[in-house]
Amino acid sequence: MVPGRIITELFAGSLTMRGCFMQIFYIGLFGAFGCLSRYAVSGWTYTLVGRGLPYGTLVVNVAGSFLLGLVMEATLHSTVLSPEVRMGITTGFMGGFTTFSTFSYETFRLFEDGSYLAAGANIVLNIVICLVFAGLGISLAKRI
């Protein structure tokens, strides 16, 4: 289910009030864990490799791309996860964990500071590596 359709489906009668509440609950719960995980992974990354580029953002975006590809593909035609938990993981956790807005801001600041090569590298690394890892997650899920 597409997240923006929760309320629409509730009013259309295809989603119960309990189902709607559970999806919203899991999105919030998993979202909190996603935010905390992003904070931890970014901080850990910066202590390992420094802050020459926004490596913390790159690492969470790469990991998030892989995990989203894996979870979406592994649960696409499966009942391993309830729809509510799946929504919590994909929309909540991944929404809190990945950071496209931060990537955009940090890249803009690099341009603004005159670090054009670093800004370009940040764009290429985030887009290319995240696409590759999303594909790897999907490929892994198909083999499970």
What positions do the PLM features span?
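Membrane-interface helix-loop junctions in multi-pass transporters/channels
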Residues: P3-I144
